[in-house]
Amino acid sequence: SEAAAIATPTATVTEDSGATGDSSDDGDDGEDSHATRHLLESVALEHYADKLRAAVEHSSQAIEDYGAKHREARGMGATVTAALVMDGQAFVANVGDSRTYLLRDGKIERLTRDHSLVERLVEAGQITPDEVYDHPSRNLIYRSLGAGHAAPEVDIFVEKLRPGDTLLLCSDGLWEMVRDPQLQQIITEHDDLKKACERLISAANDNGGEDNITAVLVRCLEA
């Protein structure tokens, strides 16, 4: 079992005054500055998302390379969910069925989408979300790092953060054992993130603990 807790100040996109060009007296300065700011923000968003995607792809290739050199590790795979918090935004990468949640104003919301058979069944209306937890095929995934997927398709989600927001990154060993209402309750009841992580892992073990359990909590503070 693994647990981690992080608190980070929320940041804002800053603008270099030299990037807006020369000033003029034609009354368009405000509009030009506003447009330039949006352009800078868009470029920054794409940059961070691309860097995060590249890091995940590099990790997948590293797993493939290791498997090629070690016969016992051939076909080895992994899932990943990762968050990069920059400029007041959370950039979340996901491959497989690990998850990232957002807790805001006491309510929990899943940001990621599982690359699993049961997720597709839910989307098709063939099973309910609650039936995922007991479905015999709940561990079948169609995307992973390694396992013959040197360049997996990486989902990237972007969420603008507010002070007080909390991100939970976790493996299926947590969310399959601790359902969303209990995740929400535990995180809400603990201001100390380390204690909240420990309680999440204890709850997963108390509920059966069928798999490895990883939980990471990240809380955004005032800048």
Which sequence ranges carry the predicted segments?
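PP2C/PPM-type serine/threonine phosphatase catalytic domain
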Residues: 1-223
